[in-house]
Amino acid sequence: MKSKAIILLLLAASACSPANISESTEYPPIEPDCTGVTIPEGIAPLNFEMKDGREFKAERTRVGDTIWTKVTAWEKGSDNAVTYAPFPMIVSKDPIDPYIAYRLIEPGYENWHDMGLYQRELASYRETPIATNQINNRGCVNCHNFYASSPDRFLFHARGEGGGTVFVDGDEVKLVNLTKVGTGKQGVYPSWHPGGRYIAFASCKTYQRFSVGDSQPIEVFDETSDIIMMDTATDSTWCIPGLSEAGKLETFPHWSEEGDRLYFCCAEGDTISCEERGNIHYALKSVEFRDGEFSKEVRTVWQCDSASASFPRVNGKWLLFTRSAYGTFPIWHREADLYLMNLETGDVRSVDELNSPDTESYHSWSTNGRWVVFSSRRIDGRYTRLYISHFDGEGHFSKPFLLPQKKYEYNQLRLQSYNVPEFITGKVENRARKYRNLFR
């Protein structure tokens, strides 16, 4: 058993607590709620505040693998205080990757000023840029993807005049315009094959529309979409037979861990109009991949006539995906939730321990498959923030906790959404000068 340690955190403005203290058997009403969560060893402290704004102090005691936090709270200037029942946080033996990469973007509909790809060290509150849109005259920067979660080999899109896909491989940085090689199609939603040579992309013609007086005021949808492959050895691209068919919309490719199967989402239809969007339901499908060739047999993994799947992510026999009422852009769907499939049995369930009344969308597994990071709008319904949960390997997730911040109010002060979180195994080096040289 680890030695017992006591940490006293004075989070109140007053130097001392009131003299009259009563006790409560309830946990303290705090935000974010971190009572009973499971955390990785060495993560930055999970700071919180009282929901009602009262001053407080917190005493944290670690016994073995459990951190107990006792909170005493009082109104400013009052002689009376309440000490709440200590609440636990379980420290897991399963390690977590040291960094998370994501995009930060203002949640506007049409325009943005600043956006960029950033990385957060989980052992601290330190956030550093990977690439911002200052490199390409404030164009769009998005669609980052890492080979095997490596900070030394990855790609991202930098759009606008002279734009393309930026490929990083150690000290080498290059720009490839996918529309000028092979198929002539642009690529989004990249997924790097575990072997390192191939990358699957979706190639989509995307629109957004607004509705007045509708429960869904904005809708983003693909009019057309296919899946294409890139060979990084030759910088060539080609359409995948059976995954770029007329009469179908294919998107969101994702490789299995062994690289022997490609999962993707597919809906029926040549082209889709805004008026038809509510009738479009994407199924989960997969196709075998061996020795650089795809099988002609496409399997249906999951399908529902009244729901749509997106973002399939495989972890051994488990597949985590986002389910929404329809369409292919769940971030604007309040009903969007995370679902888990057992690929061996075919059983599917709503991950109620992670879901909320608001949007849950993009998600990513850690490299050891024991943690998941996902995006949620549960705090205010507008800004997307990141939550982390432990996975026991048997189909169960722990209560999620909000990405720790030095002060909880930072979550309200940051007027940007976290987008496409991905675990990475180390810190990405600063290559800003090399990126800027690509766009001169």
For each feature predicted by the language model, list its residue ranges:
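Sequence signature of WD/YWTD-type beta-propeller architectures
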Residues: 16-440
